[in-house]
A protein has these predicted regions:
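N-terminal intrinsically disordered, cationic/polar leader segments
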Residues: 1-127
Length: 127
């Protein structure tokens, strides 16, 4: 387990100051087959112009032993606020880090980012 993931000993959930911890926390799967988490609070900046990009993120996975804790996901997604990233690269990074936290093969995690229109163009990247 990396330093950006935790299992069961929650840091983010119910603790003041937890917004400084940007890791993904997990808990034992209670028996669900598919989990879908959707957030419209993901932001990053264009690595070229520095302009803000706003996203709707959908993360779907088929859990085995572990599930993602939602507050830790919210805080994790907020860490990208100041990061320069293209939509496509961000989708891959999130997929890979979620898969690692859940101890799943990357093929068991699907991430779709819909970048809100800027310049009249909407971008959707899925992995």
């Amino acid at each position: 387990m990396t330093e950006t993931t935790r299992e069961t000993e929650f840091v983010a959930l119910g603790h003041a100051g937890s917004e400084h911890y940007a890791g993904l926390e997990t808990f034992p799967n209670p028996g669900v087959e598919v989990v879908e988490m959707v957030s419209d609070e993901l932001t990053a900046v264009c690595p070229i112009t520095g302009q803000p990009d706003f996203y709707e993120a959908t993360i779907e996975y088929r859990p085995q032993a572990l599930c993602l804790e939602s507050k830790s996901l919210k805080i994790y997604l907020s860490r990208f606020r100041e990061q320069g990233a293209f939509c496509e690269a961000l989708a891959v990074q999130i997929r890979d880090e979620v898969a690692e936290a859940l101890r799943l093969d990357r093929s068991a995690v699907h991430v779709t980012l819909v970048q809100k229109p800027r310049g009249g163009i909407t971008i959707t990247a899925s992995v």
